[in-house]
């Protein structure tokens, strides 16, 4: 299953939003008709399961969708008050957020129901597709701050326009708008470093399931070559293919 990193609020531009009760209901009803698969992320993003929209009840403002195959996961999901749905119908990144779910009966079986989201984000531009990098032997990002101090951080997600890195604590001097010159990293099996400058776009403090807190730092490539963009695209395609084979 393709794993696309969740977009931060700062990265979601208004022009990509589909808003209004009728347009939102119409779009999701289409996903239900085609049985488009989605992943639903909950528990502060620490848990997820695969689901399929089953029906939309516009008069009640409800979305009905499949339960997980795990009783324990379903119980934890029902305690979540913020859930993020991510899918790629027709190759287009689709994402929306809902509130808490409740269990309902649907066509003789159990299902979940949530209030329809206020809006849906649809991103078709290739530079907005981000993929989470493998957690085993992660990519390592190298950069330098203005004072010359070295940054060496594991990469959480990557696209042809930028990447996200994780840090146990926010490094001194790291803030949105700061430009990092002479950055580089190497893709697994590639053996050739990519060199570029990067602009920090956002920083976000997150909490793991264990309760430990860490930082996610989003960066934009400034001068990546077209050849390096192609190498990143191939890397993303390989990750998606391998994950699909394992699903």
UniProtKB/Swiss-Prot annotation:
PilZ domain span: 124-237
Top-rank taxon, per record: Bacteria
Protein keywords: Bacterial flagellum, c-di-GMP, Nucleotide-binding
Function noted in UniProt: Acts as a flagellar brake, regulating swimming and swarming in a bis-(3'-5') cyclic diguanylic acid (c-di-GMP)-dependent manner. Binds 1 c-di-GMP dimer per subunit. Increasing levels of c-di-GMP lead to decreased motility.
The family this protein is said to belong to: Belongs to the YcgR family.
Subunit structure: Monomer. Interacts with the flagellar basal bodies.
Protein name: Flagellar brake protein YcgR 2
Organism, scientific name: Dechloromonas aromatica (strain RCB)
Top-level taxonomy: Bacteria, Pseudomonadati, Pseudomonadota, Betaproteobacteria, Rhodocyclales
């Amino acid at each position: 299953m393709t794993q696309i990193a969740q977009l931060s609020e700062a990265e979601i531009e208004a022009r990509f939003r589909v808003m209004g009760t009728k347009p939102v209901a119409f779009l999701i009803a289409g996903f239900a008709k085609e049985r488009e698969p989605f992943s639903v992320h909950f528990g502060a993003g620490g848990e997820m399961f695969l689901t399929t929209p089953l029906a939309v009840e516009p008069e009640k403002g409800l979305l009905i969708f499949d339960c997980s195959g795990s009783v324990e996961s379903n119980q934890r999901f029902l305690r979540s008050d913020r859930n993020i749905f991510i899918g790629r119908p027709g190759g287009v990144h689709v994402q929306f957020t809902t509130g808490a779910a409740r269990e309902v009966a649907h066509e003789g079986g159990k299902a979940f129901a949530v209030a329809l989201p206020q809006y849906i984000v649809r991103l078709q531009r290739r530079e907005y597709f981000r993929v989470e990098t493998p957690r085993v032997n992660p990519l390592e990002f190298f950069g330098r701050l203005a004072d010359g101090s070295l940054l060496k951080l594991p990469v959480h997600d990557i696209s042809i326009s930028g990447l996200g890195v994780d840090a146990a604590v926010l490094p001194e001097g790291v803030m949105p708008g700061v430009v990092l010159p002479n950055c580089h990293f190497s893709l697994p099996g590639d053996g050739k470093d990519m060199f570029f400058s990067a602009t920090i776009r956002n920083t976000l403090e997150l909490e793991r399931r264990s309760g430990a807190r860490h930082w996610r730092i989003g960066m934009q490539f400034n001068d990546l070559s077209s050849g390096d963009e192609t190498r990143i695209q191939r890397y993303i395609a390989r990750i998606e293919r391998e994950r699909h084979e394992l699903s």
